[in-house]
Amino acid sequence: MVSKQQTMGFQTEVKQMLHLVVHSLYSNKEIFLRELISNASDALDKLRFLALSNGSLFENDSDLKISIQINEKLQTITISDNGIGLSWEEAVENLGTIAKSGTKEFISQLTGEQAKDSQLIGQFGVGFYSAFIVADKVTVKSRRAGLQPEDGIVWESKGDGEFTIGYEKKSTRGTEITLHLKPENDEFLSDWRIRGIISKYSDHICWPIVMKKLSEEGKESKEFETVNKATALWTLQKSEISEEDYKQLYKHISHDYMDPLTWSHNHVEGKHEYITLLYIPAHAPFDLWQHEAKHGLKLYVKRVFIMDEATQFLPRYLRFVKGIVDASDLPLNISREILQDNKQVESIRAACTKRVLSMLEKMATNDKETYQKFWNEFGLVLKEGPIEDFANKEAIAKLLRFSTTASGSEKQEVSLEEYISRMKEGQDKIYYITASSYNAAKNSPHLEIFRKKGIEVLLLSDKVDEWLVGYMNEFAGKKLQSISKGKIELGDDETSEQIKEQEKTLEPLIKHIKSVLNERVKDVLLTNRLTDSPACVVADEQDMGLEMQRILQAAGQQVPVSKPIFEINPDHALIKRLHDIQDDNQFELWVTMLFEQAVLAEGGQLDNPADFVNRVNRLLVSS
């Protein structure tokens, strides 16, 4: 008997989601069962975890399982579990609302490919709504463990924008979901069809999934049998697990639609005993760059599920890794707070980090094509590594990939080891330039002398690159040097002597330029970097790089005041022309224009662009 029944409207986002799920996945209907079994498995995990500290939640029934029953006469499928269950408030919250951001992201991720889109619903935590792909009505009966039988609830909806919810006595805890199938979906009333779907998607679920036994004639009996392997797959030896099993387990724990690129499965014995199963995904999740996004590994203690998103077992720059840690020696009642200061956790973290880096190094060495796919998805995150993880800095540096002047492409595919193997005789530094974009880096005037001498330069245009080179100042004994900071020594004694001579000759001109630019520059020098451009701006050796200054300013942060050095090319026609200008106003116009032109060439911004345009126009008219 249902009491206190209410009719409520779905949140707007749920209506959108229902429409999207039903209409975008209609040709891959069978995934509804995978999603509902996955939810039931989570409910059993939660109950077992909470019962560690409150055994009464078992209510004298610790035989945890998922049950599936078919009723051909009523045209229904019922998926039930004796897990944690739902209270009234939880049913309204979990079945009637979703995060607004989730809907937006879901829509943006839809590809039109049924196989991919079918996996997205699990990734976005809306798997329950897949029930409406096959059902025209869904009934949920549930009671949260620990509540009274009278607190049982019944929730029902036709997926048409509203649902009803009321109280109904339920003697057992857990959740029972009944799907009233649409006439065209009667294929799912076949026992063998359902068993086939379970075998395909849910064989690896570690809880028993039970169905009624079939006689030799194909008739149901009253007895139940387990229809999945119901094994904690990761506890088996590698030789006992097929490649397909590994892939299916990955898809279950990650809600990903693609196979992983690779994985590492290890049983560790000794002072600490634990199992790790770590996966490298094939593509980046939608929330990789959201600071509050959940990440981390699933933690089990002696096969008992403890928590999702245990972030303590991997550093943040490896947040894309999915997997499981099953520790034998951690206390069952461990909390996130205790994990922070636990010596064994630190040991497992160090081992997991080295294992992931080793996996990636192996991939980079043996399968360059697959590693390039990985880099295209996760390279930007891996660049955070040397900043966060000093102990593994060298190992991470080997995995980094860059665009260079030799590669001739924006694609980041050159390793530091490759760069060193191509260094010119006598070259003892790894040269790089940072800029706001690949094109800005590729076309920087600072590259002119390096192109002339055939010296390769790393082109760094990701925002993280400025921090990266700040923490990684050398590799394999070779210092990394910015070509837009300080002096550049290319071992050309003849050029150095020539510049010294020119400095003496052009001293009056240099002083005159300094007096014009005054407080806008730290110094004016002759350059050895330019061959085609008249001038450039560089940062002093000890100052913050110009690109880093721009990044911090754009982020609204205080930036130490540092002025650029203005370097002029004495062999350029425009600089030679300055010699002949007698009129001070005209000289000032030319110098200011050349300086501002150099700032723009470096990707900088002018305080007053209109003044610059006006100056250029005046010079064009007078020339």
Swiss-Prot record:
It holds the Pfam family HATPase_c_3. Residues 551-623 are annotated as: C. The keyword Protein biosynthesis does not apply. Keywords: ATP-binding, Chaperone, Cytoplasm, Nucleotide-binding, Stress response. One of its GO terms (cellular component) is cytoplasm. It comes from the Bacteria. GO terms for molecular function: ATP binding; ATP hydrolysis activity; ATP-dependent protein folding chaperone; unfolded protein binding. The keyword Nuclease does not apply. Residues 1-336 are annotated as: A. It is found in: Cytoplasm. PROSITE patterns: HSP90. Signal peptide: none annotated. HAMAP family: HSP90. Homodimer. Belongs to the heat shock protein 90 family. Molecular chaperone. Has ATPase activity. This is Chaperone protein HtpG. It comes from Legionella pneumophila (strain Corby). The lineage of its organism: Bacteria, Pseudomonadati, Pseudomonadota, Gammaproteobacteria, Legionellales. The gene is htpG.
